[in-house]
């Protein structure tokens, strides 16, 4: 832990107490001036009303009331007050009412009140901070004496937190010139420690004579008195801390990584440790992009300094055996090491940022997923929402009121729009031409279903997972990048470059304390957001298994290094995958084209197959769209809604939790029964097995459509649209007819999958390729394999002629074919068997024969019925 002097008044704490002599204390004139000016600011600053420029000439009472209502909240999210009382006196009242100890100061107010005071605090905030805290104590003592008595009795540390600081610095721009000055930085939180107590002012007892020391301010590390106050005691090292008389505050350390937009080309992102105290702890979570306001300081590296006198400062060199060591075993290292120690001597100081206030760059309502009923919305206090916790919108009306007038008007137009579904589809990723079905799926993923909990407290996810499969250069990755560009808590990662720990979470050891902490992975960082995974098929099988739990249960379980935890990963997953071999083979099913296991495929609600087909008309339109994009850029798109309008509409719909009426329940059950019948009958070959998860997908998609249309009930039309999307995703497989071989007997040119299975001639020459519908071929091949398995001759094998005779006899008895069609069906069956042996590797010739009909066939050891 890092100990600091936060919350210490110089009148109450002394660093070096003297035994006998009392020296006259020298007053810092700058601190005295700052204290008086800040006290004057707290007493006299009043927030003036803002008047709409358009209504400057209207002085009637109605216009004044309208202006007051429209500007009830300022741009900082703070409710504006009337000017009959000091603004910050009211803020102190709120602070006391909310049981907080931090007063939030808008730095713009301070600079407006006194530019000299603002400039002084910007330049030397670390030096002047005790003075403004003294001013706050005097202010509270004057107006709220009862609260001040409680502060003194309970040893509460009062603090001042500034926001809206004009000086913004990038993480990699922090230099020694910034030490002690006030500035704000922005970054993404990657790791948070647990909240611990921090010793601010320590009171110690001498172990020799039991004399109490004066309060000792902790200077970045555990600091004890230099000498006992008892003149008859010579103790300088043996001390016992007096916990009852000491002052503690909450402390938390977070690691922040600079934003992607701030990283120069060819550079890796920089990280910085930030210390939070008091009311600021637990306001930043892993994955949040926040703005921190505070001061940069250099602190002693306690882990290096606390080892002892024989600390090994030079790597690989024993302190007492080499030349240059004193006789007593201590290294004689001076302040100047020279060029020989460059890169060898350990640094005893390091940079740390002490933050006063934390403000999320996006409101908690921007989260894509709304929690189950009963959960706290957002999970943590909003921005500097400690000022007024009532500002968090709790209904559609309050959310509308919190928007600026221009955004409110545009949102009201969207609410009244009759073609909102199609307009939103046209507004999603306008730089991509076509792909309307994919845009519909992505749009429904943004709105999501309703999170639920069973009576057994089992969570039922409402997030929708989508996977886009297709040929290269079909704009798969563009959809992922588009969502990352404007949605909050959206994380982009690549499957090939990500490990299981990088996607879920890992346990790391704190170098200072030695404790093990959990560091969030991509799925944890995207909690209440979207995780975009590119090259999903390139993930290792072990890494794919790691995200099974996160995709269905939406949790990540960790049991490492003595840590047993179940972490939230309530995120939607948008994945992009390439087919095996780089191109989608239409003669194979979706599962055969993807390097993804069946359990993982069933966790996706929607699959979309995108093919790069040569079509002169579509190619011309796509090329024209791309050229216009390069020529006119943003002006080339004519999207009905902007990204900001889409985000506001999504936030607005999150307050709606649609329910399912009885008529929709029966319709959902009917659609599910039909999908299961397709899976077993073979009339249409599904892309993968239909399970109960597909029924839950239907429910989620229907709820998302109802939420999109602002309906509180899931109407049958929403269920039908959800079923259409799901069937297009899992039943409609992009396949060509299967080529069986050459037809030399003028028997068949094209085998159609009609009711009678009759062959038709295609062409007049009588010579061509024999083709078969893919669904018919798949059904026939599975039937032949199943017969070999059920005959009990899996190991010994079966003659090809016996297998064909069984199939023809079965077709005749079932009335599927007639006696006139036996010769044609026999030839087709022989060609299917040849393809199963030579192409599909589903059958193996165990005993060859010069006559193909008499060879012995067995099932290939690697054959799977689920293919």
Swiss-Prot record:
Q: Where is this region: Disordered?
A: 51-76
Domain of life of the source:
Eukaryota
UniProt-annotated binding residues for ATP = 473-474, 476-477, 578
Q: Which gene encodes it?
A: mcm6
Name the source organism. Answer: Dictyostelium discoideum (Social amoeba)
- Family indicated by similarity: Belongs to the MCM family.
Keyword ATP-binding found: yes
- Tell me which Gene Ontology terms the entry assigns under biological process: DNA replication; DNA replication initiation; double-strand break repair via break-induced replication; mitotic DNA replication
Q: How does it assemble?
A: Component of the MCM2-7 complex. The complex forms a toroidal hexameric ring with the proposed subunit order MCM2-MCM6-MCM4-MCM7-MCM3-MCM5 (By simililarity).
The record's listing under InterPro entries reads:
MCM, MCM6, Mcm6_C, MCM_CS, MCM_dom, MCM_lid, MCM_N, MCM_OB
* Arginine finger, short sequence motif: residues: 602-605
Q: Which EC number applies?
A: 3.6.4.12
Instruction: State the protein's name.
Output: DNA replication licensing factor mcm6
């Amino acid at each position: 832990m890092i100990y600091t002097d936060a919350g210490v008044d110089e009148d109450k704490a002394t660093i070096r107490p003297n035994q006998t002599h009392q020296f006259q204390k020298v007053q810092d004139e700058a601190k005295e001036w700052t204290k008086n000016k800040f006290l004057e600011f707290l007493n006299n600053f009043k927030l003036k009303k803002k008047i709409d420029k358009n209504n400057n000439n209207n002085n009637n009472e109605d216009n004044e009331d309208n202006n007051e209502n429209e500007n009830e909240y300022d741009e900082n999210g703070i409710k504006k007050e009337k000017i009959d009382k000091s603004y910050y006196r009211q803020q102190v009242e709120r602070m006391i009412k909310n049981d907080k100890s931090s007063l939030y100061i808008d730095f713009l107010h301070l600079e407006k009140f006194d530019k000299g005071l603002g400039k002084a605090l910007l330049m030397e905030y670390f030096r002047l901070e005790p003075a403004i805290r003294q001013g706050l104590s005097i202010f509270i003592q004057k107006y709220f004496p009862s609260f001040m008595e409680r502060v003194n009795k309970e040893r509460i540390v009062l603090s001042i937190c500034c926001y809206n600081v004009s000086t913004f610095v990038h993480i990699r721009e922090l230099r020694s010139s910034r030490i002690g000055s006030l500035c704000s930085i922005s970054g993404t939180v990657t790791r948070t420690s647990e909240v611990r107590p921090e010793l601010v002012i320590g009171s110690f007892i001498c172990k020799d004579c039991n004399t109490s020391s004066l309060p000792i301010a902790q200077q970045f590390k555990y600091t004890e008195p230099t000498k006992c106050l008892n003149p008859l005691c010579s103790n300088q090292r043996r001390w016992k801390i007096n916990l009852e008389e000491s002052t503690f505050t909450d402390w938390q350390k977070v690691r922040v990584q600079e934003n992607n937009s701030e990283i120069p080309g060819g550079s890796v992102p920089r990280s910085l440790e930030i210390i939070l105290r008091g009311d600021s702890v637990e306001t930043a979570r892993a994955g949040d992009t926040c703005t921190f306001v505070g001061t940069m300081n250099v602190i002693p590296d306690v882990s290096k300094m606390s080892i002892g006198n024989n600390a090994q400062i030079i790597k690989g060199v024993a302190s007492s055996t080499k030349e240059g060591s004193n006789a007593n075993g201590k290294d004689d290292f001076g302040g100047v090491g020279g060029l020989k120690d460059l890169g060898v001597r350990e640094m005893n100081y390091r940079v740390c940022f002490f933050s006063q206030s934390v403000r999320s760059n996006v409101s908690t309502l921007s989260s894509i997923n709304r929690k189950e009923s009963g959960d706290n919305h957002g999970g943590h206090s909003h921005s500097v929402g400690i000022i007024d916790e009532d500002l968090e919108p709790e209904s559609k009306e309050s959310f509308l009121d919190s928007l600026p007038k221009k955004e409110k008007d545009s949102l009201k137009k969207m609410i009244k729009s009759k073609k909102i579904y199609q307009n939103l589809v046209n507004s999603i990723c306008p730089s991509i031409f076509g792909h309307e079905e994919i845009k519909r799926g992505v749009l429904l993923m943004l709105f999501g279903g309703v999170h639920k909990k069973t009576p057994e407290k089992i969570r039922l996810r409402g997030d929708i997972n989508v996977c886009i499969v297709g040929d290269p250069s079909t704009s798969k990755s563009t959809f992922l990048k588009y969502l990352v560009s404007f949605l909050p808590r959206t994380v982009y990662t690549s499957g090939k470059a990500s490990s299981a720990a990088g996607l879920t979470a890992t346990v790391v050891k704190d170098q200072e304390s030695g404790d093990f902490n959990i560091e969030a992975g991509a799925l944890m960082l995207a909690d209440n957001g979207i995780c975009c995974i590119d090259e999903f098929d390139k993930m290792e099988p072990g890494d794919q298994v790691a995200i099974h739990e996160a995709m269905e249960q939406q949790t990540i379980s960790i049991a490492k290094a003595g840590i047993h935890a179940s972490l939230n990963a309530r995120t939607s997953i948008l994945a992009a995958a390439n087919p095996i071999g780089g191109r989608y083979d239409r003669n194979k099913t979706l599962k055969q084209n993807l390097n993804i296991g069946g359990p993982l495929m069933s966790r996706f609600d929607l699959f979309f197959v995108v093919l790069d087909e040569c079509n002169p008309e579509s190619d011309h339109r796509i090329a024209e769209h791309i050229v216009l994009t390069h020529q006119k850029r943003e002006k080339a798109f004519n999207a009905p809604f902007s990204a900001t309008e889409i985000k506001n509409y999504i936030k607005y719909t999150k307050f709606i939790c649609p329910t399912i009426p009885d008529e929709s329940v029966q319709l959902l059950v009917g659609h599910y029964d039909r999908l299961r019948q397709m899976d077993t009958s073979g009339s249409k070959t599904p892309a993968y097995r239909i399970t109960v998860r597909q029924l839950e997908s239907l429910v989620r998609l229907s709820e998302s459509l109802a939420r999109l249309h602002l309906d509180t009930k899931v109407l049958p039309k929403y269920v039908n649209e959800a079923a259409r999307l799901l069937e297009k995703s899992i039943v409609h497989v992009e396949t060509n007819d299967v080529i069986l071989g050459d037809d030399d007997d003028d028997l068949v040119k094209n085998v159609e999958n009609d009711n009678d299975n009759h062959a038709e001639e295609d062409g007049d020459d009588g010579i061509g390729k024999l083709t078969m519908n893919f669904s018919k071929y798949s059904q026939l091949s599975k039937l032949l394999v199943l017969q070999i398995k059920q005959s009990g001759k899996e190991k010994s094998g079966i003659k090809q002629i016996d297998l064909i005779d069984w199939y023809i006899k079965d077709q005749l008895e079932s009335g599927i074919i007639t006696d006139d069609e036996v010769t044609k069906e026999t030839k087709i069956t022989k060609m299917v068997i040849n393809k199963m042996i030579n192409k599909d590797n589903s059958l193996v010739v165990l005993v060859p024969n010069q006559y193909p009909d008499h060879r012995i066939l067995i099932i290939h050891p690697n054959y799977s019925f689920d293919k």
